[in-house]
Amino acid sequence: MLLVLVVLIPVLVSSGGPEGHYEMLGTCRMVCDPYPARGPGAGARTDGGDALSEQSGAPPPSTLVQGPQGKPGRTGKPGPPGPPGDPGPPGPVGPPGEKGEPGKPGPPGLPGAGGSGAISTATYTTVPRVAFYAGLKNPHEGYEVLKFDDVVTNLGNNYDAASGKFTCNIPGTYFFTYHVLMRGGDGTSMWADLCKNGQVRASAIAQDADQNYDYASNSVILHLDAGDEVFIKLDGGKAHGGNSNKYSTFSGFIIYSD
C-alpha cells in the first residue's frame, strides 16, 4: 500500500483548454492527450504547477525496499589446472631398502707382486717332523701283527720295531703304505690288513696259483688322535721276511697337524 501511495503522489493533473494532459513529476510521464511543447508565450501556470514542473528534472525518490539476503549460490565448476609450481625442498632420507641379490662375479684381478709358490722355510720349520720306514727281516705266518724290525727312518720316534706299531703323539692327518711279499709254493693265499686301533682300514691279498711269490699292498690317509695305533696284521698265509733286502715294508708320515 505504501508503494502505491509513493507512485501516485508525484502525479499532477492539469488541463490547458481543450488539450488537457496528465504530467508525472520525475522522469516518467503518462500522456493521454497531445502534449505540445510550451513556448515562451504559453499561458501562465499556477504556482503549484510551476513548482511541480520545475521538479520534473530531478530524479524521483527511490521506491525500492531492500529485502533479506539471498541464499548462497551453487559451487562453480573447477577451473583449469594452474601452471606447475616451483620445486619443493628435498625430503627426508627414507628407510633402508631390502637386501638385493648377490651380483655376478667380477673379472679376475691382476697378478700379485708375490714370488713363486714355493713353500717357505718357515713352513718347513713349523710342520712337525714325523715319518718312518721299516722292512721285514723275519718271516711270519698265520694271524699275527707283522713286526717290521729293520728300521731305516723313524723321525719323531713314533714307530716301535718291537711291537710293529706306530703310536701317534701329534694329532693330525697321516699317510701310510705297506707292501708284503707272500711266501708261496703250496697253493695258498695271503691277506694283510692295515688296522687303526684294531679296526681294519685297508686290506690286500696275494694269491699263489702257479708261482711261488706275490705281493699284497695298499695305502691309506688317516686322521689320528694322540694315542692311536696303526699296524699291519697278517690275516692268513705266509709273509716273506727277506733278511735285509726289505721285500716287505711299512712306512708313513704326517701330512699336517691339527
Curated annotation (Swiss-Prot):
* Transmembrane regions listed in the UniProt entry: none
| Protein name, per record | C1q-related factor
Q: Which PROSITE patterns match?
A: C1Q (PS50871)
Which organism is the protein's source?
A: Homo sapiens (Human)
Q: Name one GO molecular function term.
A: signaling receptor binding
| Listed GO CC annotations | cerebellar climbing fiber to Purkinje cell synapse; climbing fiber; collagen trimer; cytoplasm; presynapse; synaptic cleft
A Pfam family of this chain: Collagen
Name all C1q domain ranges. 125-258
